[in-house]
Amino acid sequence: MTTATPDCPRCALPLSHLRIGGLDTDVCEHCGGVWLDRLELARLEDPGNAFGDALVAHLNQFPPALIDHSRRLRCPRHPSVVMLRRTYSPANPIEIDECPECGGVWLDTDELAAIRR
């Protein structure tokens, strides 16, 4: 993992560090996407989790963007690696981007809220 500020895989602007309830995330203050390191999504997916509520509230200030999901994204931590677009779970068919190198996930602005429903 690098110590440099990673760039947003959608808009290539630097991500902003956001700490919520002991969880370190990287948020794009332009498009509202969020980078979660491996296993961090599991800490936020429960609809009863207050920290997840706080992050969703922060991301809700960004309007859902018109996103080209056919465009393959590169991992903010490993820029040479193209992330895989996959279904979150059979019960929740939200598509997320996951890095095969580090297991981190990129969620577009409305995807965390959809996962937590």
Region locations from a protein language model:
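Short cysteine-rich clusters marking metal-coordination/redox-active sites
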Residues: 8-11, 28, 75-78, 99
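Short linker/helix segments within small regulatory modules
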Residues: 19-25, 87-96
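Short Cys/His-rich Zn2+-coordinating modules
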Residues: 9-15, 52-64, 79-86
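Short, structured motif recognition centered on aromatic/hydrophobic residues
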Residues: 34-36, 41, 105-107, 112
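Short, intrinsically disordered terminal segments enriched in charged and Pro/Gly residues
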Residues: 40-66, 116-117
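Cys/His-rich metal-coordination motifs, chiefly Zn-binding "fingers/knuckles"
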Residues: 3-4, 11-33, 39, 45
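Cys/His-rich metal-chelating microdomains
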Residues: 14, 31-34, 78-82, 102-105
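Intrinsically disordered, low-complexity linear regions
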Residues: 2-7, 66-77
